[in-house]
A protein has these predicted regions:
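Sec-type signal peptide cleavage vicinity
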Residues: 2-10, 19-299
Length: 299
């Protein structure tokens, strides 16, 4: 009988980890690990999904899932799903070494319905992010490991997209009792390919070459909207936002050259008046999540 263990360590690294062990493992086991349950730690505790990031982050949500694939060059392998119920993680399906000698690839992906696997490493941006659910599902977090089978391994997770948050103000004298509608954010690309750099043990994003896309943003809180875009370069004067007030169309341009990076949030202030539309960058934040320095907030 196999067991599933969840280890929670705030004091050491602030990680929520899922370890999978076999009851039959002991010091007298055969040298080969073929068929043995994999004892893996996924560092998801320092990560947060983007809907949580709209607030203060610091937690995964009920029904969040990670899809984990394991394969080799000669074996298509198998897939399991890690599910969170608001308190603990569990898994479905087998998670075992395919053989005891070949280099294995383990690829963990959020959201779990992302069609990543051995034969498909292309990410297509979801352009309708007008609801919080759609915004969350447009996120992309990956974990990658490549090596020969071993008893214990750690798989770090990494945000791959860029988050744009707009804090806006509409002049009440110019537009009384009116609000922004149909906000859109410009993504320089609508898809991107990834590749396995096995020599360096990295899962890397190639330079995107796909067509640009307008992303329907999610309005949230009071006077804010957000969207996830594929990292890319923006030039001064390039139209970055589109929106409406009443039946009138507006756009806002970048005021400086900006390079969006993986796993960062770019926050802007948008001021709209009768004769002005001004976009000003407020901050750039690294969305690695939290660490052990504030574990008291997580308990």
């Amino acid at each position: 009988m196999k067991t599933i263990k969840q280890r929670i360590s705030y004091a050491v690294m602030g990680l929520i980890t899922m370890g999978f062990t076999a009851c039959t493992q002991n010091e007298d086991m055969a040298p080969t690990l073929k068929g043995q349950e994999i004892n893996a730690t996924f560092s998801v505790g320092g990560m947060q999904t983007r809907v949580n990031t709209l607030g203060d982050g610091k937690n995964w949500e009920d029904k969040d899932k990670l899809k984990v694939s394991i394969f080799t060059d000669s074996d298509p392998g198998s897939t399991t799903v890690l599910s969170f119920n608001g308190e603990t993680w569990s898994r479905s399906g087998s998670f075992r070494w395919l053989n005891g000698y070949e280099q294995h690839t383990i690829l963990a992906v959020y959201p779990s319905d992302t069609d990543f696997g051995k034969n498909n490493l292309q990410y297509d941006l979801q352009t309708d992010q007008s609801s919080e659910g759609n915004l969350k599902n447009a996120d992309l977090i990956t974990g990658y490991w490549y090596d020969a089978p071993r008893f214990d391994l750690s798989i770090p997770m990494k945000h791959r997209m860029s988050l744009v948050t707009i804090v806006y103000h509409v002049g009440t004298a110019d537009y009384p009792n009116m609000d922004i509608s149909e906000p859109q954010v410009y993504s320089k690309h609508n898809s991107v390919d990834f590749s396995r750099d096995d020599r360096q043990g990295q899962f890397v994003m190639s330079t995107p070459t796909a067509n640009p896309a307008w992303v329907q943003a999610c309005k949230h809180d009071d006077g804010m909207f957000s969207a996830i875009v594929i990292p890319g370069s923006y030039k001064t004067g390039e139209i970055f936002l589109k929106f409406k007030i009443g039946d009138k169309n507006f756009h806002a341009k970048m005021r400086s050259n900006t390079e969006f990076q993986e796993g960062h949030r770019y926050t802007y202030k948008l001021d709209v008046g009768k004769d002005k539309v001004k976009l000003t960058q407020i901050s750039v934040d690294d969305l690695k999540g939290w660490d052990s320095n504030n574990e008291e907030d997580l308990k």
